[in-house]
A protein has these predicted regions:
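Short secondary-structure transition/capping segments
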Residues: 87, 116, 241, 313-315
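Extracellular interaction modules
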Residues: 209-211, 329-337
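Solvent-exposed beta-strand/loop surfaces of large extracellular or lumenal domains
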Residues: 194-211, 302-325
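Catalytic-domain carbohydrate-binding cleft regions of carbohydrate-active enzymes
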Residues: 1-212
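Short, surface-exposed charged micro-motifs
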Residues: 162, 183, 268, 313-315
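Short acidic, gly/pro-rich beta-turn/loop elements at beta-sheet edges
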Residues: 28-30, 182, 226, 287-289, ...
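Accessory, solvent-exposed terminal regions and/or long lumenal/extracellular loops of proteins
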Residues: 218-306, 320, 327-332, 341
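Conserved, charge-rich beta-strand/loop surface module that forms ligand/interface-binding patches
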Residues: 44-50, 59, 314-321, 326-330
Length: 342
């Protein structure tokens, strides 16, 4: 059925998209819609509940991770659950946060969905994570391109309890209970907290996340392309609009390939850390801003062997452990070198 519908739709319009069901734990545990007929999927209707036995957010998280492991790409769930009367504020917020790190961000179903009719706290937090999902579209698009070429699924199991990788470089441990506490078993290596990169974790930890925070972490060596146009998330503001923000958490070496979701142009970014940090961009790169997580202020910053002007073309924010490089004629610059104080 799904394959025939999708085939017919494409005959009518080459840009046709259908919403299919990727996973049905009751009837088809091996997967529901065929992968070649599932451009966008959701995991059925959940209730406005937390627990698995009540078909709540726990079920949605489980089924989306299973869908990713089965090879589905763009998958999501009804934020807050589809069925029921009232959506508890804590549940609505946590479900939104989880959905920000899914391929599909879907806000539909029963209950009050007009944020201006809900609490100010819900409006501000849900707005923040809604925009974050939009900002991550360049990363999501490139991750899906990688998956289509035989690479890692956009969502894949990350060990522990309902933990998963979102693309190659983001690790998530969604909150599936009405609690701010989360025990996390981190994958091998060091992981920086996405919303406060001064915090680095490894091994097994029990951490606390207030309602406006969420367990999402950056791999050492991560390079995350983002489209930032507002100041809701903390990753930039309106001055970032029109440029690709490259959020970099340097490791020893990393090489990533990206596809711009608007132009379809391909480019690569490599990072090498030794005495300093060397960043090289190749291909049809977009205009960009570099945001590099660093624990110390640099001595000098070079672009194609020319020293950049501090405060004008680069700035180090000590409180955030973040170096921001926004040089003039940035699209023509191919290589950056960051030298530290000895």
């Amino acid at each position: 059925y799904y394959r025939e519908e999708y085939k017919h739709g494409l005959q009518q319009n080459p840009q046709f998209i259908t919403l299919s069901r990727s996973f049905d734990s009751y009837l088809h545990p091996e997967g529901f819609a065929p992968l070649d007929a599932a451009p966008v999927s959701w995991v059925g209707d959940q209730d406005h509940e937390w627990r698995l036995d009540k078909e709540g957010i726990e079920e949605a998280i489980r089924d989306i991770i299973r869908s990713g492991d089965l090879g589905y790409g763009v998958v999501g769930s009804d934020i807050g659950g589809f069925s029921g009367s009232k959506i508890a504020p804590e549940l609505y917020i946590r479900w939104t946060q989880f959905s920000a790190f899914c391929g599909l961000f879907l806000n539909g179903g029963h209950g009050e969905r007009r944020l201006w009719e809900r609490s100010l706290q819900e409006l501000e937090i849900i707005r923040k994570f809604s925009w974050l999902h939009t900002e991550l579209i360049p990363y999501i698009y490139s991750s899906l391109t990688n998956q289509r070429n035989g690479g890692q699924s956009l969502v894949s199991s990350g060990g522990g309890s309902y933990q998963y990788f979102f693309g190659q470089d983001i690790f998530c441990a969604p909150i599936f209970e009405n609690s701010n506490s989360r025990t996390i078993k981190f994958p091998k290596g060091k992981w920086r907290y996405l919303f406060n990169p001064t915090n680095v974790y490894e091994g097994k930890k029990t951490l606390t996340f207030p309602l406006d925070e969420y367990p999402a972490f950056l791999r050492e060596g991560a390079i995350i392309p983002m489209n930032v146009c507002r100041d809701y998330t903390g990753f930039g503001d309106s001055t970032s609009c029109g440029k690709t923000t490259l959020l970099i958490n340097p490791g020893k070496t990393s090489l990533k390939f990206f596809v711009d979701p608007d132009t379809r142009k391909k480019y690569s970014v490599s990072v090498e850390s030794k005495k300093g940090i060397l960043i090289a961009l190749d291909g049809e790169k977009p205009e960009y801003i570099l945001k590099i997580i660093m624990d110390n202020s640099p001595l000098i910053v070079l672009a194609d062997n020319q020293e950049l002007v501090e405060k004008l073309e680069w700035n180090y924010i000590e409180a955030d452990h973040l170096l921001i490089i926004n040089p003039s004629s940035v699209i023509d610059r191919k290589q950056f070198y960051i030298q530290f104080r000895i």
